[in-house]
């Protein structure tokens, strides 16, 4: 950080790190809200995709990067500006990936229901007419629209983190 560009790069990394941290808190709040609006979506989305495993993996990766940044501090482990900035950028990238996974998880929990699990289980085993398929599709679309409306209505009345 001996040059102006090194100092500016460090400030930019720290600023984006703070913004990503706030986005992570907001994304966690969105997952919580999705679970409140559609509790059956938790169990339904578990079998529909592997987002839970991917999200846990991103949490662990981000925790390790954060632990590495914190462990490298102190007088015994002095880092130069380039190393410090590189660690902050790595942490920022990990937080961005974590935020993306959390947002995908909240959408998955909001949209999926046990009807989707049942339909996936019986796919190809029971012949359905076009009329039945159209009714199920319409019902699924109405449910998704209703859940999204509930989600945004809840978000408007309970804004996270002072927004």
At which residue positions do the language-model features occur?
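Long amphipathic all-alpha helical oligomerization modules
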Residues: 70-163
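Extended amphipathic alpha-helical interaction segments
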Residues: 21-108
């Amino acid at each position: 950080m001996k040059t102006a560009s090194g100092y500016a790069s460090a400030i930019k990394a720290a600023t984006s790190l703070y913004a990503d941290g706030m986005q992570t808190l907001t994304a966690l709040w969105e997952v919580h809200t999705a679970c409140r609006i559609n509790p059956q979506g938790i169990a339904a989305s578990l079998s529909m995709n592997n987002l839970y495993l991917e999200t846990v993996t991103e949490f662990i990766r981000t925790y390790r990067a954060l632990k590495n940044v914190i462990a490298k501090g102190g007088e015994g482990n002095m880092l130069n500006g380039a190393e410090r900035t590189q660690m902050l950028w790595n942490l920022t990238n990990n937080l961005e990936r974590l935020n993306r996974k959390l947002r995908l998880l909240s959408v998955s929990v909001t949209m999926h229901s046990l009807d989707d699990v049942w339909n996936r289980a019986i796919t190809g085993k029971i012949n359905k007419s076009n009329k039945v398929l159209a009714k199920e599709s319409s019902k699924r679309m109405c449910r998704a629209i209703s859940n999204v409306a509930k989600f945004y209505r809840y978000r408007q009345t309970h804004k996270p983190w002072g927004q």
